[in-house]
From Swiss-Prot:
UniProt source species: Aquifex aeolicus (strain VF5)
E.C. numbers: 1.5.1.54
Designated name of the protein: 5,10-methylenetetrahydrofolate reductase
The keyword Lyase is assigned to this record: no
Residues noted as binding FAD in the record, renumbered to the chain: 49, 51, 77, 107-109, 127, 149, 153, 162, 169
Function comment: Catalyzes the NADH-dependent reduction of 5,10-methylenetetrahydrofolate to 5-methyltetrahydrofolate. Is required to provide the methyl group necessary for methionine synthetase to convert homocysteine to methionine; the methyl group is given by 5-methyltetrahydrofolate.
Top-level taxon: Bacteria
GO cellular component, one term: cytosol
Entry similarity comment: Belongs to the methylenetetrahydrofolate reductase family.
Any one biological process term the GO annotation gives: tetrahydrofolate interconversion
Length: 296
């Protein structure tokens, strides 16, 4: 089932993101998580793709296993900057062959520890170029998602530039978007309003990261430029050495964040699960009565 088609019908989307584990035990734990979250009847799940194509085979194998062993609609992430166009076409053809219809088209991170690193000759240097390549080579076979950044990508000079580039990805053929994680809903609302004013009309699904490990989230937020409210930082700092208290505060914050987003008419919620189900299940349980009807 194509995610873009579902969203265009106005169906409220609930989705979960996973990453491909490095070990057999990690994979066993992932599928334990998937089985628990599958009961929530998500619109789709997605599987990340490592920097520089480092998880190429693992991502592909997990995507195929979810596709074949569950009833879930699965979307494969694909980063382009470290691949030639020929490699990208091979990867996409393989996904088409096994019946995958949804791709999240991303540029991917430039290696921070390799200042002299350059993309391979003929690579797609931007996500927009990957979207164009997919449409050129595969037409409408794939529903294409792209990333969006309510506070601006760390490399963006300003939010106006961010919206302009986002619009280029949409015009290239993107069907929907998932945002980078954020903790201040007003930044999301501002971004969506700017997009509407720029003539962008695809669904922009908020990305939700439940805080269960303060140190880890601080690092993630710093890398992607997401603002954590000072009031939340102060609460978490007081219990930093008490993991269960951190988790409790983080889940409560995410519940309130999601309820506010639902009240403001968002098209869905995308949860960054980090391959764990507990926090997401608790959040869903608390918000489920407020979620709009989800039948297709």
């Amino acid at each position: 089932m194509k995610i873009g088609d579902i969203l265009r019908k106005g169906v409220f989307s609930i989705s979960f993101e996973f990453f491909p584990p490095k070990t057999e035990e990690g994979e066993r734990q992932l599928f334990e998580t998937i089985r628990k979250l599958e009961k929530l009847n998500p619109t789709f799940v997605s599987v990340t793709y490592g920097a520089g194509g480092s998880t190429r085979d693992r991502t592909r194998n997990i995507v195929q296993k979810i596709h074949e062993e569950t009833n879930l609609t699965v979307m494969a992430h694909l980063t382009c900057i470290a691949h030639t166009r020929e490699e990208l076409i091979d990867i996409l053809q393989d996904y088409k062959n096994i019946g995958i219809e949804n791709i999240l088209a991303l540029r991917g991170d430039v290696p921070r520890d390799k200042p002299d690193w350059r993309p391979p000759k003929g690579a797609c240097k931007y996500a927009k170029e990957l979207v164009e390549l997919i449409r050129k080579e595969f037409g409408d076979w794939f529903s294409i998602g792209v990333a969006s950044y309510p506070e601006g990508h760390p490399e963006s000079p300003n939010l106006e530039w961010e919206v302009k580039y986002f619009k280029e990805k949409v015009e290239a053929g993107a069907d929907f978007s998932i945002t980078q994680m954020f903790f201040v809903n007003d930044y999301y609302y501002r971004f969506v309003e700017m997009c509407k004013n720029a003539g962008i009309d695809i669904s922009i699904i908020p990305g939700i990261m439940p805080i269960t490990n303060f140190k880890q989230i601080r690092k993630f937020a710093s890398l992607c430029g997401a603002t954590i409210p000072q009031s939340l930082i102060e609460k978490l700092e007081k219990v930093e050495d008490k993991p269960e208290e951190v988790k409790k505060i983080g889940i409560e914050f995410a519940i309130n964040q999601c309820l506010d987003l639902i009240e403001h008419g968002v098209p869905g919620l995308h949860f960054y699960t980090l391959n764990k189900s507990d926090a997401t299940l608790k959040i869903y349980e608390a918000i489920k009565d407020k979620i709009p009807a989800r039948s297709t």
